[in-house]
Amino acid sequence: TGFRRSIDELKIEDFLEVYNTNVFGLSLFTKEIVPFMKNQKSGTIINIGSTASLKGYATGSIYSSSKFAVRCLSQCWQAELRPFNIRVCQVNPSEVTTAFANPERVERDEVHNKLTPKEISHAIISAIEMDNRGFINELNVWATNPFN
């Protein structure tokens, strides 16, 4: 969920819509699964962030700040859950050819220089498959040449 608005056009309702999904929804879901992972004394949580969580951009106040919040939650949960052998990894994709920005949720055609869900799934699988002795705290997945 994302809104592109300049600072003078920001509305609290837009912040709430994005934060309800990206921050509060993630937090509530994670709160529900953590007891099961603690009980089994292991687990891996993958949070999908965005490269927007690494650096803000013009008209990105709402979306970027929500992904910065996800990044902070991931870091807090890493520290909190490591004693229980629960790994938390945040995956930060750059632009991916999905229906993300389409209000009708129509999938976009694959673009030769943008990432696809396949690349992101490979990153997620690599983080999950790592031996439990280690964990990847954050993966930044960039399109090689998105400007071509």
Where are the regions a protein language model picked out?
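Residue(s) in the substrate-gating loop at a strand-loop-helix junction
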Residues: S50
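Short beta-loop-alpha junction of Rossmann-like oxidoreductase domains
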Residues: R5, Q90-R105
